[in-house]
Amino acid sequence: MRVLVAMSGGVDSSVAAARMVDAGHDVVGVHLALSSAPGTLRTGSRGCCSKEDASDARRVADILGIPFYVWDFADRFKDDVIDDFVESYARGETPNPCVRCNERIKFSALAARALALGFDAVATGHYARLSDGRLRRAVDADKDQSYVLGVLTAEQLRHALFPIGDTPKPQIRAEAAERGLAVAEKPDSHDICFIPTGDTKAFLGARIGVRPGAVVDGSGTVLAEHDGVHGFTIGQRKGLGIAGPGADGRPRYVTAIDAETGTVRVGPAEDLEVWELTGERPVFTSGVEPGGPIECQVQVRAHGGITDTVAELRDGKLELSLRAPLRGVAPGQTMVLYRPDPDGDEVIASATITRR
């Protein structure tokens, strides 16, 4: 099988490539250049798409004896990920750019080019598992990335490979060291790759500008002024510009955002609780829509935010009734549905949260 491996220059994708070679596949490595200004994006302690990352990936490819290329996806990444991120925050939403990148770049634009060039599959260093076409959680629960892959369609998954999903991260690093790969101890990435300073508010402010509004309490009393709703997200407690807790002495959190009026509402923690969720643009991993209610679990962020639920497709949207409340759920987040399974919880659907 001809396999294209997306190589970031990190340890995970490097071991993924090595395992594809071990399996006897015809392997080619490709590094995605996602920025027209290398160094303005980052992974770990260095820049994503930086010369260092590309060089690390190339050195691994040389050790493995596979061809290696750098493909420029900077324009597509800007349009489909960065601009989408900025526009979502301007609407008062909280998007996950990693979800969007997987959906529109790695398993869409990249996969389409790979298939057009005669490759059978695209392999990545994601921590997730595929068995019989079913997407499951990784063995390493702390590193599991099935959530950010939950938006993939059955057709996209048919051409995807996740070679490291059955192995804990410490063993991946040990394997890289045994193979003599210099990236064995390279730091993991944790922040948004296209915000090198880590200051999301400043990044958004530079692109959205000043859009004044008010911070109000549950009664509508104005507590403070702000420069734009892009500086807030549901569940936020710090940086609200207000004079401490409420009259009852309890902390206050962002509980609602109205981008049209520029209003940010704050309230006590219990105001964050939701028992129902609605999601648009649902994707069913099997490619088949359910015929009735589904007993499952829902996850609303990359790590944590999981509860039992009953999901039902109504008028093209997923309607969820939660068995226990979730807190800090924001429009724009992705909700991923799982079917519990002793062999690894299976992803069955996803959607973008529109109402909480």
UniProtKB/Swiss-Prot annotation:
Q: Which GO terms describe its cellular component?
A: cytoplasm
Name its cellular compartments. Cytoplasm
Please list where the region (Interaction with tRNA) is annotated. Answer: 143-145
User: What reaction(s) does this enzyme catalyze?
Assistant: S-sulfanyl-L-cysteinyl-[protein] + uridine(34) in tRNA + AH2 + ATP = 2-thiouridine(34) in tRNA + L-cysteinyl-[protein] + A + AMP + diphosphate + H(+)
Keyword hit for Transferase: yes
Q: List the catalytic residues.
A: 101 (nucleophile), 193 (cysteine persulfide intermediate)
A GO molecular function term, named singly, is:
tRNA binding
Q: What is its EC number?
A: 2.8.1.13
Annotated site residues (Interaction with tRNA) in this chain: 126, 333
Q: Please cite one Gene Ontology biological process associated with this protein.
A: tRNA wobble position uridine thiolation
Q: Does the keyword Nucleotide-binding apply?
A: yes
Q: Which domain of life is it from?
A: Bacteria
Residues noted as binding ATP in the record, renumbered to the chain: 6-13, 32, 125
| UniProt keyword list | ATP-binding, Cytoplasm, Disulfide bond, Nucleotide-binding, RNA-binding, Transferase, tRNA processing, tRNA-binding
Disulfide bond annotation, renumbered to this chain? 101-193
One Pfam family this sequence matches: tRNA_Me_trans_C
What InterPro entries would the database entry show? Answer: MnmA-like, MnmA-like_C, MnmA-like_central, MnmA-like_central_sf, Rossmann-like_a/b/a_fold
Q: Which HAMAP family match?
A: tRNA_thiouridyl_MnmA (MF_00144)
- Give the family from UniProt: Belongs to the MnmA/TRMU family.
Function per UniProt = Catalyzes the 2-thiolation of uridine at the wobble position (U34) of tRNA, leading to the formation of s(2)U34.
Q: Could you tell me which PANTHER family the record lists for this protein?
A: MITOCHONDRIAL TRNA-SPECIFIC 2-THIOURIDYLASE 1 (PTHR11933:SF5), TRNA 5-METHYLAMINOMETHYL-2-THIOURIDYLATE -METHYLTRANSFERASE (PTHR11933)
Q: What is this protein called?
A: tRNA-specific 2-thiouridylase MnmA
